[in-house]
Regions:
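Structured, charged N-terminal subsegments at the starts of enzyme catalytic cores
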Residues: 207-264
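Basic helix-extension-helix modules of the SAP/HeH family
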Residues: 1-68, 73-111
Length: 270
């Protein structure tokens, strides 16, 4: 059991305990200008300032389960829980400086709580979280069905059947922010500028992934309902499913056979 206690660190100090590469990734995702040799503290200062100015970024970055766990921890200060059950949530929340997990103790950053408590408890935020989870589940359902998808065509399908008001820019921003916490081994292509987003592994020749796609422009996808996409995603355990890297390998090996048209996502590099 892990006891929940207050951290003595400031919010900037908490953020700065993250690996430098994580701070650089987060800075890139939320549009912060930084230098390659910038220190952890300097990056943390810029991130804190950005999140204070734009707290709405937090609900776009963090999954609903992570924010619900954070609210639970705030209510349970001084009590204990089984930390192993919330490993993914703890990882996400530490990434943004809300807490750390040390020596079987969950340390809550009080400065972060003071600054973000009311915004994260609002009804509007709860609605945004539910909307984000809905969109995330649809995207994962598409991933499992098609193997690899293009973000632009993805947006068209979602607009036609599920989110008619969703714009391409909104979908791109959501994915760019949220994939920081998705499982690795996935690749996302932006058809508008041919940019590939990767997380933890690189592809020797990125173009090979899309050769068949380019040659066979007549290829198309069967359309499904929102519930079918979401049920498939949930059936595969979206958040903690270990099969995403295996799916990635399978798609890469079979792309030559025209069995799959290309997305795949990942979370560290662009």
């Amino acid at each position: 059991m892990a006891r929940i206690e207050e951290s003595k660190r400031t919010y900037i100090e908490e953020l700065a305990t993250n690996p430098r590469v994580n701070l650089m990734v987060l800075s890139e995702r939320i549009d912060i200008v930084f230098h390659e040799d910038e220190s952890e503290v300097s990056l943390a200062e810029k991130i804190a300032e950005k999140l204070y100015d734009m707290p709405q970024l937090i609900t776009k970055l963090l999954q609903q389960e992570a924010i619900e766990f954070l609210l639970q921890c705030w209510d349970m200060e001084g009590e204990s829980l089984i930390a192993e059950m919330y490993a993914r949530e703890i990882e996400q929340l530490h990434f943004l400086g809300f807490l750390s997990y040390e020596d079987d103790t969950i340390l809550l950053n009080i400065e972060a709580k003071d600054n973000f408590f009311f915004s994260l408890k609002s009804r509007r935020v709860q609605e945004e979280l539910e909307e984000g989870t809905r969109l995330e589940n649809i995207l994962f359902g598409m991933l499992f069905l098609y193997g690899i998808l293009d973000i632009y065509e993805c947006c068209q399908m979602i607009q036609e059947e599920m989110f008619p008001e969703l714009t391409y820019d909104e979908l791109e921003e959501f994915i760019l922010l949220r994939i920081v916490f998705w499982q690795s081994g996935i690749l996302l292509r932006n058809q508008m500028n041919s940019r590939l987003l990767l997380a933890s592994r690189e592809v020797e020749n990125r173009n090979e992934v899309f050769i068949q796609w380019s040659l066979r422009e007549d290829l198309s996808w069967k359309r499904y309902s929102e519930d079918e996409y979401k049920n498939l995603a949930l059936g595969n355990g979206i958040g903690g499913w270990d099969g995403i890297p295996e799916l990635y390998d399978f798609v890469m090996k079979n792309i030559e056979n025209d069995q799959y048209k290309a997305v795949s996502y990942t979370h560290l590099r662009a």
